[in-house]
């Protein structure tokens, strides 16, 4: 496996390094995106493709009386996210699970908000994943997709040649799927 393939599904030592790097490297983008997410103190939030758990930690601060769940299909990511959020996990206001966004175990209409930071690029069945998110999201809830790349530059497309299974969607494409 090439090192950058660990952005899609982190495994082994390279994956552990990658999730730590993503926790740092995506910080500015996440801070920017979270400014647009309005949450009540007691909100229930799901972070899809939660990676190393840095955004779960931020979400917990935004809804201190709520509950934050994370899901990722990489065991390496789940382990790191649990470690980063061990305090919240230990007091039962957070849980991080291994799973597939296209087929989630969560109850219907349970989440006030669902987030996806730098992850929809790697979802093989985007339409099914969005249907599942719609199912678990409460009526009137918010789905925040926060991507650095939107396919508007050649720089964006270079990553699809480096990382297998990566698709960069233009804004209009994502809106069509939604």
Tell where the protein language model's regions lie, with residue ranges.
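A generic alpha-to-beta junction signature in SAM-dependent methyltransferases
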Residues: 37-39, 62-63, 137
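A short glycine-rich, Lys/Arg-flanked "PGG" loop and its adjoining helix->strand segment in the class I
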Residues: 127-139
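Conserved alpha-helix/loop element of class I SAM-dependent methyltransferases that forms part
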Residues: 24-43, 58
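Short glycine-dipeptide loop
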Residues: 42, 137-142
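A short acidic, Gly/Pro-enriched loop at the edge of an enzyme's catalytic core
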Residues: 102-114
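Class I SAM-dependent methyltransferase SAM/SAH-binding core
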Residues: 44-103
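A short SAM/SAH-binding and catalytic strip from SAM-dependent methyltransferases
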Residues: 112-126
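C-terminal alpha-helical "lid/dimerization" subdomain adjacent to the S-adenosyl-L-methionine
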Residues: 4, 10-23, 142-178
């Amino acid at each position: 496996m090439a090192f950058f393939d660990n952005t899609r599904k982190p495994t082994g030592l390279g994956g552990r390094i990658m999730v730590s790097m993503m926790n740092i490297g995506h910080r500015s983008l996440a801070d920017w995106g979270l400014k647009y997410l309005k949450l009540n103190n007691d909100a229930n939030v799901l972070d899809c493709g939660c990676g190393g758990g840095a955004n779960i930690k931020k979400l917990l601060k935004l809804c201190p009386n709520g509950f934050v769940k994370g899901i990722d299909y990489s065991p390496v990511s789940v382990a790191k996210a649990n470690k980063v959020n061990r305090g919240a996990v230990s007091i039962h206001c957070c849980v991080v699970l291994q799973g597939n966004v296209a087929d989630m175990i969560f109850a219907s209409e349970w989440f006030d908000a669902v987030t996806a930071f730098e992850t929809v690029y790697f979802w093989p069945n985007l339409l099914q994943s969005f249907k599942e998110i719609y199912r678990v999201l409460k009526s009137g809830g918010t789905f925040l997709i926060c991507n650095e790349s939107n396919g508007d530059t050649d720089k964006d497309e270079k990553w699809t040649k480096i990382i297998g299974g990566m698709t960069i969607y233009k804004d209009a494409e994502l809106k069509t799927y939604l």
